[in-house]
Every structure is written in structure tokens, then in C-alpha cells.
Curated annotation (Swiss-Prot):
Location(s), subcellular: Cytoplasm
UniProt keyword annotations, A-Z: Aminopeptidase, Cytoplasm, Hydrolase, Manganese, Metal-binding, Protease
Pfam families referenced in this protein's UniProt entry, alphabetically: Peptidase_M17 (PF00883), Peptidase_M17_N (PF02789)
Record-given protein name: Probable cytosol aminopeptidase
HAMAP family registered for this protein in UniProt: Cytosol_peptidase_M17 (MF_00181)
Gene Ontology cellular-component annotations: cytoplasm
UniProt-listed InterPro entries: Leucine_aapep/pepB, Macro_dom-like, Peptidase_M17_C, Peptidase_M17_leu_NH2_pept, Peptidase_M17_N
Residues where Mn(2+) 2 binds: K274, D279, D297, E358
Entry's Gene Ontology molecular function annotations: manganese ion binding; metalloaminopeptidase activity
Cofactor: Mn(2+)
Residues the record lists as binding Mn(2+) 1: D279, D356, E358
PROSITE patterns according to UniProt: CYTOSOL_AP (PS00631)
Length: 503
């Protein structure tokens, strides 16, 4: 799909090109109380009051998400006009904008329209410029057009015909909007990779498959990939990681992917993604209901790989290292048992009280491995705890960090990217729940504050660098009729790296 930018100040009568240019449809916003947006006012004048008459007749009340097509409109080059309800003008925020553009895309994609002129990006949203509106609109469109059909015997063809979108933006934002297009397309491509990896079944998306995916990203985008096998992992003394992998016939992989966009001596940001390609719970076996969704337990890994692809396509001036420990968590005669004690790469001994608390066991060795890069910051991403889903639901990812500056950067990025996160506590008092009578630390701390104690466990392995943990158990995929991976938190991570790179 082709996206282009055209500057226009509707208030200064600069709309001639939009009024006369050929297009299958021009998209206009209407607020409640019969208030026309700036572009709608100009089109209303050109059509001799048609938009006003439609609104006054009650055919378009401006309620958020409502849409109405007008056909064969005289006075403009477009063959159709799509009116989109924006809701109340004084409540027009990020969510209202996202709802409006999503409704617009759904209406457009249900037609045979090929080329669209899109004016909604110029709407005032929380004092943001129109380049932000362009990026959010492209991501909403790509979200609507995403389909996972590669496992079907007859993949479904695209049902829409949309090929080209022309965005009108404020003239002062034209340069930034062109960059926003590039970033949005790269980000959407990264999210699609993340979704594809998550949606693949566990018999296809194995640890080896993830390793090969990392190698392909490296080959396609000029990165460096290292994929360590069982013997190399053993040589690194990653006893905690290996304790999870031991009962599976699928060999574990330890993936390291390097992107160098800055000087070689510049400290990298390290992203660590949990890569459990299927989680049965091990000997602490999960209930059978909805266990199929445990193929999504590698979404932390998928989001890290998707972010690396997006960063490479954007060409960010920053160094980034991705680390993905990946394996299956299976029961079997060789499986780790509740009560077993294992030794981590750091040398800390861990009493495994529950084998279904395995994500932290593979992440802790990866966090220790990250020390060798002398990182500027380390962010781990994991579908770690059901407790986080209970606490935050499916809207906010859980953010844990003792570093206020790093946490602040991530929260700012989450707001800018419209990929929400909520900071959770990480007080030292919670560490007491992880005490073990027989080892240095237990891998669970009981039912109270389960998401917090999981993060506390990880924090024991992060003394050497600024660190944050994102628990995406509630946000990485949707269940039920809409079952599928979401691609989150790729937007948050990418925005954090964009901000760090100063781009």
C-alpha cells in the first residue's frame, strides 16, 4: 500500500488541490453538535452546503465511530465523501481519534475504493501534531488489514482494493509526516512479524524456528545473529534455563541479535524476550482448558524480534542487542520436579517450587548474559504472570523498574505510541516472599502480589545496569472469538528506541 503526504492549511484556502484532485473518496470528520472539522468546512463550501444539510437533516449526528458515505458529490474531484463521527469536541483525545480512524478504515475497506484522501490526521488530538496522526492512522489501517492465513490450505485473498492513501497535514508538519510514514510502515511490519510468530502453532514455531527467524532478520537487514545450541548453553552454565528445557525433545536455543546504528563504542540497549514456544506448565501441569493459547508464551520473544526488524527498517541511530532464550516447558521423565534446586548462570541457587513459573527461570540467565554488553539499559519482555492479567486486564502492560528515569522514559513512550503501560510496585519488602529454606531463592512467592514477586525474582539478576520488566501476559494476545496475537508491545519498545536515538 502506498502512502503519501500533502501539506494543506484549510483555514487559509489552500485546499484547491484536494478539491479538484481525482480520488475515489475524501474522508472528513464531524463532531457532535453538528460541528464540522476544518477540512469539512472547506468541502462544505465547495459543495454549496451539502455537508451542512446532511448534518442538519440528522443523517450524520457526529457520534464517535459513526460513518456515512455520500456519492456523486458535485464541486469536488472525489467521487465519494466519507463522513466520520468524532464524538464530543471537548473529549476528543487519543482514544477518540483511534476509534474514528478505525471506523473510517473499516468503512473504506468494505468498498471497492482504491485511492483515498484522508484529512483526519490534522484533527487536534491532545496538542499533538499531524505527523502523530498520520502514524496512528497507518497503524490502525495495518491492524485492520492484518490477516493470518498461512496455515490454511487455501489462504484467503485480501477482501479490499485500497491501494493508495494521501494524507493532508499541516504544512509545518509535512517533513515530520513523511518520516512518520516511514516509521509507521516499519513499525507495522515489525508488528506483523510479531503477530505471525505468535499465531503460528507450537509444532511450527519451535525454538529452532525462532532461531531461523532471527537469522533471516539478520540476513535481510544487515544485522548479526548468533544462535547458541545446547552444548554452548551448557558451557555458559545456564542451569536455570536448562532446567526448563530438559524434558522437551525440541532443543533449546539462545538467540543473540545485534543491530549497530551508532558508533561501536556506544553502549547498547538490550531487549530480552521470553521464548517459551509452548508452555504445558511442566510437572506442575496447567488445566487443559485454553491450553492451546500457551503457544503465545513466546510473545515476549516475538515482540523483541519484531522490534529489531522495525528498528532496522527505520535505520535508527542506536545500538540494540536482542536476547531470546527459547525452549518448550514440557512434562516427562526427565522434567524438573517441584522442590528441585538448580543453579543459575549467576551462581544463585533456585528452589523450583512450581515448574509453571518457568519464564523467570529462563530470563534470569539471559539477564546475567546481558552484563557482557555493558548496556545503557536492559528491558525484558515476557508473558510472565496470570497475576498481571488479574491486576491490569488487557489494556495496560505491567511495567516494573526501580530506575525512575528509565520507567519514566518507557511510560512516555507508551503514551506517545498509544501502547499503554502502568507502573507497578517493586518494593524491597516483597522480596521476603521469595525466601527459601533450602536455596538462595525460591521461584515463586505465593499468591499475594504474584506479578510483583515475579519481577522481584528477576531483579535479583540485574545489579549491573538500569533495568525494566514488561509483563505482557494480558496484552500480547486476545482470546475468544477474536483470538490472535496483538503485536504489542512493539510500538512501545520502538518508540522508546526512537526517543533514545533522538529521531
Amino acid at each position: 500500500m502506498d502512502f503519501s503526504i500533502k501539506g494543506c492549511d484549510w483555514s487559509k484556502g489552500e485546499a484547491k488541490g484536494f478539491l479538484t484532485g481525482k480520488s475515489d473518496c475524501i474522508v472528513l470528520g464531524i463532531f457532535e453538535a453538528q460541528t464540522l472539522s476544518g477540512a469539512a468546512l472547506d468541502i462544505d463550501t465547495a459543495t454549496k452546503g451539502l455537508i451542512s444539510r446532511v448534518v442538519k437533516a440528522g443523517d450524520m449526528d457526529g457520534k464517535r465511530g459513526k460513518t456515512l458515505f455520500l456519492h456523486e458529490v458535485s464541486g469536488i474531484g472525489a467521487s465519494r465523501v466519507l463522513l466520520v463521527g468524532l464524538g464530543k469536541q471537548d473529549a476528543f483525545n487519543q482514544k477518540a481519534y483511534t476509534d474514528a480512524v478505525t471506523a473510517a478504515w473499516r468503512a473504506l475497506l468494505s468498498t471497492k475504493i482504491v485511492q483515498v484522501t484522508f484529512t483526519l490526521a490534522q484533527l487536534p488530538v491532545d496538542e499533538r501534531s499531524s505527523d502523530w496522526g498520520v502514524r496512528a492512522a497507518i497503524l490502525a489501517l495495518r491492524n485492520e488489514t492484518y490477516r493470518f492465513t498461512q496455515m490454511k490450505s487455501k489462504p484467503e485473498p485480501a477482501s479490499h482494493t485500497l491501494k493508495r492513501v494521501v494524507f493532508s497535514v499541516d504544512p509545518a508538519d509535512e517533513k515530520a509526516a513523511k518520516l512518520a510514514v516511514k516509521q509507521a510502515v516499519a513499525l507495522a511490519n515489525g508488528m506483523d512479524l510479531t503477530r505471525d510468530l505468535g499465531n503460528l502453532p507450537g509444532n511450527v514455531c519451535t525454538p529452532t524456528y525462532l532461531g531461523n527467524t532471527a537469522k533471516k532478520i539478520a540476513k535481510d537487514w544487515g544485522l548479526k545473529a548468533e544462535v547458541l545450541g545446547l552444548k554452548q548453553i551448557q558451557a555458559l552454565n545456564m542451569g536455570s534455563f536448562l532446567s526448563v528445557a530438559r524434558a522437551s525433545v525440541e532443543p533449546p536455543q539462545f538467540i543473540v541479535l545485534h543491530y549497530q546504528g551508532a558508533a561501536a563504542k556506544a553502549a547498547p540497549v538490550v531487549l530480552v524476550g521470553k521464548g517459551i514456544t509452548f508452555d504445558t506448565g511442566g510437572i506442575s501441569l496447567k488445566p487443559g482448558e485454553a491450553m492451546d493459547e500457551m503457544k503465545y508464551d513466546m510473545c515476549g520473544a516475538g515482540s523483541v524480534l519484531g522490534t529489531m526488524r522495525a528498528v532496522a527498517e527505520m535505520g535508527l541511530k542506536i545500538n540494540v542487542v536482542a536476547i531470546v532464550p527459547t525452549c518448550e516447558n514440557m512434562p516427562g521423565g526427565n522434567a524438573t520436579k517441584p522442590g528441585d534446586i538448580v543453579t543459575s548462570m549467576k551462581g544463585l541457587t533456585i528452589e523450583v517450587l512450581n515448574t509453571d513459573a518457568e519464564g523467570r527461570l529462563i530470563l534470569c540467565d539471559a539477564l546475567t548474559y546481558a552484563e557482557r554488553f555493558k548496556p545503557a539499559a536492559v528491558i525484558d519482555v515476557a508473558t510472565l504472570t496470570g497475576a498481571c492479567v488479574i491486576a491490569l486486564g488487557a489494556h495496560n502492560s505491567g511495567l516494573f523498574s526501580k530506575d525512575d528515569a528509565l520507567a519514566g522514559e518507557l511510560l512516555d513512550a507508551s503514551r506517545e505510541a498509544n501502547d499503554p503501560a502502568w507502573r507497578m510496585p517493586l518494593d524491597d519488602e516483597y522480596q521476603d516472599q521469595l525466601k527459601s529454606n533450602f536455596a538462595d531463592i525460591a521461584n515463586i512467592g505465593g499468591r499475594p502480589a504474584g506479578a510483583v514477586t515475579a519481577a522481584c525474582f528477576l531483579s535479583r539478576f540485574t545489579d549491573s545496569y538500569p533495568w525494566a520488566h514488561l509483563d505482557i501476559a494480558g496484552t500480547a494476545w486476545k482470546g475468544g472469538a477474536a483470538k490472535g496475537a496483538t503485536g504489542r508491545p512493539v510500538p512501545l519498545l520502538a518508540q522508546f528506541l526512537i526517543d533514545r536515538a533522538g529521531q
